[in-house]
Amino acid sequence: MATELEYESVLCVKPDVSVYRIPPRASNRGYRASDWKLDQPDWTGRLRITSKGKTAYIKLEDKVSGELFAQAPVEQYPGIAVETVTDSSRYFVIRIQDGTGRSAFIGIGFTDRGDAFDFNVSLQDHFKWVKQESEISKESQEMDARPKLDLGFKEGQTIKLCIGNITNKKGGASKPRTARGGGLSLLPPPPGGKVTIPPPSSSVAISNHVTPPPIPKSNHGGSDADILLDLDSPAPVTTPAPTPVSVSNDLWGDFSTASSSVPNQAPQPSNWVQF
């Protein structure tokens, strides 16, 4: 049934070919085209190469009517069905057969060397394809003969899959994570870098900075507490008067009021030596 489903395909067509009756080969040295009557061909016509399955057919047909003159089945190339001559690349010896099984060897030749090249390549490509198909079929048979790997679950065997962002039975649909801080995220500082804080503006610095009132010193001495206070307190630092700002007039007024309200303490004699 496989033979009935095979179709015939055309591999090559050459409109001009000459057929020669060749003498029998006397030795195993091969055929020579110079032994033929090249100027007097026995038949001229058209050559067509077809394939059906793995077998190629060289058909010699009439140029006008297409009637079949002879046919040469080729099951292997290179082989006995098609041979090249030893003294030219344009001539070949083929084995023709009829329907009864009888066979004969004849010579064929092409006027153009390119036609002879196409004839040779068409047969080579066909049997190269046949070889590849045989290798693929052999590999598939070997694969079928190997024991198949059972990847199915055994009875009672289960697996557990943990996939994120999928509705589960208990908690329902998982909520996507949101960024903290109102959706704004800050990038971390670069490694080894230092973060510097910009200095405040001049107006803010003047309004927020208040110089503490100086503590008056007594040269004649006082109580023990006053002497200790003098040792601990740093020397007064004279600061230049800032540029008057309209915004901070009230603050300076409060400071002057507070400094004037401090009473002067009377110096008291003491046995401590003042440094």
From Swiss-Prot:
A motif (WXXF motif 1) lies at residues 252-255. The modification Omega-N-methylarginine is found at residue 180. A motif (WXXF motif 2) lies at residues 272-275. InterPro entries: NECAP_PHear, PH-like_dom_sf. Transmembrane segments: none annotated. GO terms for biological process: presynaptic endocytosis; protein transport; vesicle-mediated transport. Involved in endocytosis. Residues 170-191, 254-275 are annotated as: Disordered. Gene3D superfamilies: Pleckstrin-homology domain (PH domain)/Phosphotyrosine-binding domain (PTB). It is found in: Cytoplasmic vesicle, Clathrin-coated vesicle membrane; Cell membrane. Keywords: Cell membrane, Cytoplasmic vesicle, Endocytosis, Epilepsy, Membrane, Methylation, Phosphoprotein, Protein transport, Repeat, Transport. GO terms for cellular component: clathrin vesicle coat; clathrin-coated pit; cytosol; plasma membrane; presynapse. Pfam families: DUF1681. This is Adaptin ear-binding coat-associated protein 1. The keyword Heme does not apply. It comes from Homo sapiens. Interacts with AP1G1 and AP2A1 components of the adapter protein complexes AP-1 and AP-2. Interacts with the GAE domain proteins GGA1, GGA2 and GGA3. The WXXF motifs mediate binding of accessory proteins to the ear-domain of AP-1, GGAs and AP-2 through hydrophobic interactions. Selective binding to the GAE domains of AP-1 or to the alpha-ear domain of AP-2 is tuned by the acidic context surrounding the motif and the properties of the second residue of the motif itself. The WXXF motif 1, which is preceded by an acidic residue and has a glycine in second position mediates specific interaction with AP-1. The WXXF motif 2, which is followed by the C-terminal carboxyl group negative charge, allows specific interaction with AP-2. The lineage of its organism: Eukaryota, Metazoa, Chordata, Craniata, Vertebrata. It comes from the Eukaryota. Residues 256-275 have a biased composition (Polar residues). PANTHER family: ADAPTIN EAR-BINDING COAT-ASSOCIATED PROTEIN 1, ATP-BINDING CASSETTE ABC TRANSPORTER-RELATED.
